[in-house]
């Protein structure tokens, strides 16, 4: 890491080179460097018109050389991604784009260390960000992406924007009718509409700063397409629009065969695996109405919870008094249903078993820990494959951890094979840490809406998520109403995760009222 003096000088050079805001007006969506390895990177920008865009790069901000060019085309909303090769490991690079007389701001990133290098790595992740205003022309409804701004100030080796990087169907003004999410505005279903959503989010300076500040990994979840997306339920046309829009605005490695599955090595201590949990999944178990609760006519809110547990909460949620249809439970447990698809599951399990990195981090779109509420879109809704995966990792791979977003909450727990079922808890020994959101409705407020009970989300957190089995699921941290992110530090002997709010402070546990303690994984 640079000394403080060198950092100040470098920052001053960046400011002077970037010039006044008007100097970069042609590149007003900013710049980004993605998929960074020890020798390669993908750099991104958006021009204001079609034509050739050139990228210049160097190890000093004051001396940038031409490194590649690509056309900005209207068919890709004038976005440009250029591959950089033959970079040096663990080296800081500066880059900027040029089109005619127009210059972008200067971005920067550091390449990954060599796989053999013993180096401490620090990174952060969050997701779930929506800049939709309440009224046209107004400010974003949720916030101005302060979480992203705080992440940029942390000077991490890299940052991860982990899913729901736009909201094709915004929760601003949305309602819940019979347990179903109903957006207030028409969803963005076309390519052009999705482009507009990405431009809307990039209108926030904090996100642009984060993308320009260092290596930036992007990943999708469902809202890049539509809520709870699967091709089986929502079709290939919507998938194609979502894929192109995402690739146009995020410098990522994608193929039709493997989707967004990929992995990156950051020195001897760390390998990061990104699972694609949208491209190949089966339809949810709710298809055909087999999980509809007879009292509400909508999908049951906790079909896999034991009936004894449901009875405890029936006063709060009367539909829990109704038994769950056996066909629903059979669908959830169907071994033929998949989250990852056979090819990806095989590639991932082989790769993580072969990995020579000390710690293996799995970037995970939806929680794999068990907490029963609304399980259909999560790993719990694909129970057989969840069990197979966790059993394999438990038996074959050391030092694994799941880092997750999607549920708009901070939830930390062992990804148990079972929790409240007959026979009692069975730990996997693998922790799942869920964080966020950056800027959308929190889990607590979503539960309020789904149940129609004021503060129902906090009540369920305190009465069920926090207590240890058999009275609850025993989360070690549960903060369901905080804009947040997670920061990870990896050394040769220890991986440490700290969950932080938009001010950089530890998130507060809703059960204890105290800051959530760091999560520590010591090397086995």
Feature names for model-found ranges:
Residues 16-23:
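C-terminal segment of classical bacterial N-terminal signal peptides
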């Amino acid at each position: 890491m640079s000394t403080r003096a060198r950092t100040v000088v470098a920052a001053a050079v960046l400011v002077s080179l970037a010039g006044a805001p008007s100097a970069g007006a042609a590149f007003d969506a900013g710049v980004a460097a993605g998929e960074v390895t020890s020798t390669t990177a993908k750099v991104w920008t958006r021009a204001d018109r079609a034509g050739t865009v050139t990228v210049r790069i160097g190890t000093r901000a004051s001396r940038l050389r031409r490194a590649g060019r690509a056309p900005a085309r209207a068919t890709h909303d004038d976005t440009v991604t250029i591959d950089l090769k033959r970079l040096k490991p663990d080296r800081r690079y500066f880059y900027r784009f040029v089109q005619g007389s127009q210059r972008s701001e200067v971005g920067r990133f550091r390449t990954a260390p060599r796989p053999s290098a013993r180096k401490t790595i620090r990174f952060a992740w969050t997701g779930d960000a929506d800049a939709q205003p309440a009224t046209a022309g107004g400010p974003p409804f949720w916030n101005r992406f302060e979480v992203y701004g705080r992440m940029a100030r942390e000077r991490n080796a890299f940052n991860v924007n982990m899913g729901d990087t736009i909201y094709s169907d915004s929760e601003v003004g949305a309602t819940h009718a019979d347990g179903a999410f109903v957006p207030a505005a028409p969803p963005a279903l076309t390519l052009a509409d999705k482009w507009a959503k990405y431009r809307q989010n990039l209108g926030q300076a904090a996100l642009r700063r984060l993308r320009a500040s260092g290596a930036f990994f992007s990943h999708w979840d469902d809202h890049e397409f539509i809520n709870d997306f699967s091709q089986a339920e929502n079709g290939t046309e919507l998938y194609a629009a979502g894929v192109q829009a995402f690739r146009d605005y995020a410098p990522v490695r994608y193929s039709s065969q493997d989707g967004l599955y990929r992995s990156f090595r950051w020195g001897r201590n760390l390998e990061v695996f990104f699972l694609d949990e949208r491209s190949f999944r089966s339809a949810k178990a709710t298809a055909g109405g087999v999980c509809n609760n007879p009292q509400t006519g909508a999908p049951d809110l906790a079909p896999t919870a034991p009936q004894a547990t449901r009875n405890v909460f029936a006063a709060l949620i009367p539909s829990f008094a109704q038994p769950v249809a056996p066909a629903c439970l059979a669908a959830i447990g169907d071994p033929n249903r998949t989250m990852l698809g056979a090819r990806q599951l095989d590639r991932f399990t082989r790769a993580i078993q072969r990995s020579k990195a000390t710690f293996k981090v799995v970037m995970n779109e939806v929680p794999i820990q068990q907490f029963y509420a609304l399980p259909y879109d999560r790993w719990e809704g694909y129970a057989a494959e969840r069990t197979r995966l966790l059993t394999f990792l438990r038996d074959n791979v050391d030092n694994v951890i799941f880092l997750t977003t999607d549920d708009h909450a901070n939830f930390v727990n062992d990804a148990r094979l079972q929790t409240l079922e007959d026979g009692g808890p069975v730990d996997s020994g693998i922790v799942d840490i869920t964080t966020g959101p950056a800027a959308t409705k929190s889990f607590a407020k979503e539960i309020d809406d789904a149940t129609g009970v004021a503060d129902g989300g906090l009540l369920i957190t305190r009465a069920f998520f926090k207590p240890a089995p058999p009275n609850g699921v025993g989360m070690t941290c549960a903060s369901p109403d905080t804009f947040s992110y997670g920061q990870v530090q990896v050394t040769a002997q220890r991986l440490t995760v700290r969950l932080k709010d938009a001010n950089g402070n530890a998130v507060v546990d809703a059960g204890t009222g105290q800051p959530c303690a760091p999560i520590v994984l010591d090397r086995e």
